[in-house]
Amino acid sequence: MTDLQQVVAHSFAALAASRTTFRAQLKAREIGIISSVSFGVAQVSGLANVASEEVLKFSGDIYGIAFNVDQDSIGVVLLGDYWQLQSGDEVERTGRVMDVAVGLGLLGRVIDPLGRPLDDKGPIESSERLPVERPAAPIMDRAPVTVPLQTGLKVIDALIPIGRGQRELILGDRQTGKTTIAIDTILNQHDQNVLCVYCAIGQRASAVAKTIAILKAKGALDYTLVMVSEGNAPPGFAYIAPYAATSIAEYFMEKGRDVLIVYDDLTQHARAYRELSLLLRRPPGREAFPGDIFYIHSRLLERATCLKQRHKGGSLTALPIIETEAQNISAYIPTNLISITDGQIYLSPTLFELGILPAVDVGRSVSRVGGKAQRPMYRAVAANLKLTYAQFEELETFARFGARLDQNSQDIITNGRRIRASLKQPQSSPMTVLEQITVLIALTEKLFDTVPLLKMREAEQALCLATTELPEDFLSRFNSAKILSDDDRNRIIDIARITLAPFQSPPDEDNGITSTPSN
């Protein structure tokens, strides 16, 4: 038998064997038809058994989420190039809910809300997926917030402390430095063993590119995931982005890690949900927002928590950002988020215009649970700082009318101006705990009161530099201690006196009691 005959015989034998073992398998597919398509949404008919929130597959590898499930039609939020679809196109059920890839392979990557890479580092390496919408941790699985999250910003760490597992709202008018505070907080986690997730919702591509460049230049991208929903993307992307980012952060939390997530910003998220709801003809409410706008944010932010040790003790800290209009923090969405979160950091455009950066309005900012997590040594040196600063602001306003003040009031104003000047901090320059404590002790001891305002920044830098020359035994004792001993405190005071001596000038060289705040 020739080789050709052997090949033919073998092929026929294999065919005969397969005929005896082959069993036809039928797979049922439920197919619907697009009735209409508009900006980011579609109406679909013919899917009688579809479930709410189920993922539907359209032609061209476009997906959507079933939002409105009515008797005759389904309102679908589209997650892709909706302009490629038209009436009459087929729609197929997938039988699953929207999920996203999770895992350590996502760190250092830039992805979209569907988990697709937006950078040039190749495909995402991850074998695990989690649903985008997940229930928050049960109450009995949660632990109290007891560990501080250091932001590296004096004004926050000392006066408005944040704890790991807390939800702290950052709000203010546009261009007041909200994103800067969040990014500086991420930069300060480089040695804190905290993983970070930055979720850009409806942001300009140029602004996101600038943020990514800062993270990359400072080495923060190594422990950070960036999820981007661009402003020109369909509103469905902006809607699911924070939920998808939270699922990724929850994966790390459930592995016992401490995670920080930034939502930048939830104003765009609320507007995207309002747009989708109006397109799907859901009844509008106040400011045309749907009635469940509070619920979509509460179920998102309730996922931030601190887990008990029996659940590996991880934590998820949320920093949602929201934009106000004309300093109106009593608008609908801001009041909703203030009531949901554990405190807020308000950025004042007035302070921003005066060059006081970060422009945190201490009087209108609060942290409801972070104070319990703040390191005791902070409380010891900054306990009266907020009250002193509030008294200063009141007296300064009074002094602008030309009123004559007694010596005690003049001393309060002199000290208050130094506090305000010290709370200024350049962008991308987080401070260590030792540097902050040293500056705060010098403030409370009024060692800066004879330093001219124009030299405050230079004097503070010299004081921070002096802390690097402290001996190793002091640093070891400082890092392990909860409360600063009297000897160590006196040592810091002595160093501050020596360091600040060259910058001091007579009190009458100040800028005057009734002058406006210095830049």
Curated annotation (Swiss-Prot):
It catalyses: ATP + H2O + 4 H(+)(in) = ADP + phosphate + 5 H(+)(out). Gene3D superfamilies: 2.40.30.20, ATP synthase alpha/beta chain, C-terminal domain (1.20.150.20), P-loop containing nucleotide triphosphate hydrolases (3.40.50.300). Its main location: membrane. The record marks 365 as: Required for activity. One of its GO terms (cellular component) is plasma membrane. The keyword Transport applies. It is a peripheral membrane protein. Keywords: ATP synthesis, ATP-binding, Cell inner membrane, Cell membrane, CF(1), Hydrogen ion transport, Ion transport, Membrane, Nucleotide-binding, Translocase, Transport. It holds the Pfam family ATP-synt_ab. ATP binds at residues 172-179. Its EC number is 7.1.2.2. PANTHER family: ATP SYNTHASE SUBUNIT ALPHA, MITOCHONDRIAL (PTHR48082:SF2). Belongs to the ATPase alpha/beta chains family. F-type ATPases have 2 components, CF(1) - the catalytic core - and CF(0) - the membrane proton channel. CF(1) has five subunits: alpha(3), beta(3), gamma(1), delta(1), epsilon(1). CF(0) has three main subunits: a(1), b(2) and c(9-12). The alpha and beta chains form an alternating ring which encloses part of the gamma chain. CF(1) is attached to CF(0) by a central stalk formed by the gamma and epsilon chains, while a peripheral stalk is formed by the delta and b chains. This is ATP synthase subunit alpha 1. The gene is atpA1.
